[in-house]
Amino acid sequence: MLKNLSPSWTQVYYNAIEGYFWSPELIGRGATGNPKPWHEWHEGLLKKELPLNHILNLFFALTQQGTRDRCVSHLTGIPLTGMQFVPSVSVIQTVSSALTQPDLIFVSGSRLAFVELKVGSASNLDQFAKYVLAGVRLRAEYPEIEHVHLAVVTRPGREATVWGSRQYADIATLKAKAQSMLLDESTAWQSAAMKKFARDSSAETKRAMADAVEAISVRVVSYNELDQALAGEQSRSGEEDALVSGLRSELSARKLVSLGNTNRI
């Protein structure tokens, strides 16, 4: 019975949000008239990407080093060790919030890894280019970084359309399009940040950017991959890990993993 009274740590996160829901003056917000009941807001939050970003930020900030390394390695497809979690706000001045704010950032020695989380929306060519540019700027600030990796995590079955079009299901095609736009000095980007880059950057800078497009490793996976990595951590430890089990429960509650994964929770 006592176990049933102990909530998952992710529920504690939502409880904290509920506190601000009932006391908005604590964050300088005025009360709104006739708000929807909290449970309706909670149900809505389970469909949003931002709370999931927060939860995964907390998980990777608090989890053990080995778990962090193995999960990031599983997502990127690259064996990585010593990966440190870096809050996005720590690099905003270098990257520029107008460019992009990576969902998850990890760094270890010569390697930098970005993880982009998708729940309901798709990514696009501009967002890919902005991640490449973020890597270029961070490498300029931290010369020890030699390799940049990007993992995009989406719902099962959406891997082929995560860039908004099946024509980019092949990463090589995605890279080729980005490079051609850079080398042809195209201004046909969609985002203000990339339009500004195309307008203000020299031909040499654009060539360097095109080289970075070629060099970045990109992998698109579903949340099943993350869940499988977490399941592996549970099997490895042989005992209950509240952080891992809580995150798996969150992915299941959000219906981000397929039935083949959820029945192992």
PLM feature segments, named:
Residues 1-265:
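Charged, terminal alpha-helix-loop-beta segments
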